[in-house]
């Protein structure tokens, strides 16, 4: 019995020494690694033109789709804003070609990119607040920090992977419709959003439902992408979507950012798992 107790005491001493090393050394090594990765992610969002404080450079992306040539165009992205847009739309009924560009005095902020960048900045702030001079005293303290960092990273990723669901009246009321010159015809709606690593442009063609229409009017709810036949009320008119054209372009640095988010979340989880291993040995007391 004495031998068993001595072995148990020796094991406990070894575990406690390993745990102290984990708290004092490995945790800070992981935090430093996370900082480096997230700073790289943050640089992808800022895309400075000259020096870290310079304005974001402009990048041109050609819109395309394997399913339609009704819409073609080029979008110019500058950081978290669309600074220019050049769109050609071929009307299905008469093949009339419409051409629209952004007004020179306008830019369209992409809130998804702005929000994702802010969440990354918040995660970096949380990590910096626990620099190498900070001494973690308990595993629970590390878990709390990792949970807070993971929350910010998950929110950042979700902003890019989960576009907002909008109703057609919300799209119609959006300022994006008034960004173009010449002004968009009243039977067109435009929406722009981020989906994963892609910048998507959707054009909705509308037609008015006649007051004596026999169609059962059912307003469509919110959606990322509405389908032909979706109905809504705007002003005194009832309208229906007749055609939907979606084109997109890949933004390489958004893909980089998503990879950085995934790697960072994995590092956080691995550190949490290591801390939790020790808690199983000392489940009867705080660790």
From Swiss-Prot:
Kindly give the InterPro entries that the UniProt entry links to this protein. Answer: RAVE2/Rogdi
Main site of residence?
Answer: nucleus
Q: Which Pfam families match?
A: Rogdi_lz
Q: Which residues carry this modification: N-acetylalanine?
A: 2
| UniProt keyword annotations, A-Z | Acetylation, Cell projection, Cytoplasmic vesicle, Nucleus, Synapse
Query: In which compartments does the protein localize?
Result: Nucleus envelope; Presynapse; Cell projection, Axon; Perikaryon
Q: Which GO terms describe its biological process?
A: bone mineralization; brain development; enamel mineralization; gene expression; hemopoiesis; locomotion; locomotor rhythm; memory
Q: Name one GO cellular component term.
A: axon
Please indicate if the UniProt record lists Secreted as a keyword.
no
How it assembles, according to the record, is: Monomer.
Which family does the entry's similarity section mention?
Belongs to the rogdi family.
Q: What is this protein called?
A: Protein rogdi homolog
- Give the originating organism: Pongo abelii (Sumatran orangutan)
């Amino acid at each position: 019995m004495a031998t068993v107790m001595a072995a148990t005491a020796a094991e406990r001493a070894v575990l406690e020494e390993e745990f102290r090393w984990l708290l004092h050394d490995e945790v800070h090594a992981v935090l430093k690694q996370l900082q480096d990765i997230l700073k790289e992610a943050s640089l992808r969002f800022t895309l400075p033109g000259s020096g870290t404080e310079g304005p974001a450079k402009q990048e041109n992306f050609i819109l395309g789709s394997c399913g339609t040539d009704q819409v073609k165009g080029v979008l110019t992205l500058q950081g978290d804003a669309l600074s220019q847009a050049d769109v050609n739309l071929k009307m299905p009924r008469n093949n009339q070609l419409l051409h629209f560009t952004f007004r020179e005095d306008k830019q369209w902020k992409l809130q998804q990119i702005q929000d994702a960048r802010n969440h990354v900045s918040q995660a970096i702030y949380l990590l910096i607040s626990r620099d190498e001079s900070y001494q973690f005293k308990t595993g629970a303290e590390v878990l709390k920090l990792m949970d807070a960092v993971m929350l910010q990273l998950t929110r950042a990723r979700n902003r890019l992977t989960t576009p907002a669901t909008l109703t057609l009246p919300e799209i119609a009321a959006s300022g994006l419709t008034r960004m173009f010159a010449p002004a968009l015809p009243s039977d067109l709606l435009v929406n722009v959003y981020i989906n994963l690593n892609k910048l998507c442009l959707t054009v909705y063609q509308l037609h008015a439902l006649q007051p004596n229409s026999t169609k059962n009017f059912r307003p469509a709810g919110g959606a990322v992408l509405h389908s032909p036949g979706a109905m809504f009320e705007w002003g005194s008119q009832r309208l229906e979507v007749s055609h939907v054209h979606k084109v997109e372009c890949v933004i390489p640095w958004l893909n980089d950012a998503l990879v950085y988010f995934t790697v960072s979340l994995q590092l956080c989880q691995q550190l949490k798992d290591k801390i939790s291993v020790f808690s199983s040995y000392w489940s009867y007391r705080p660790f």
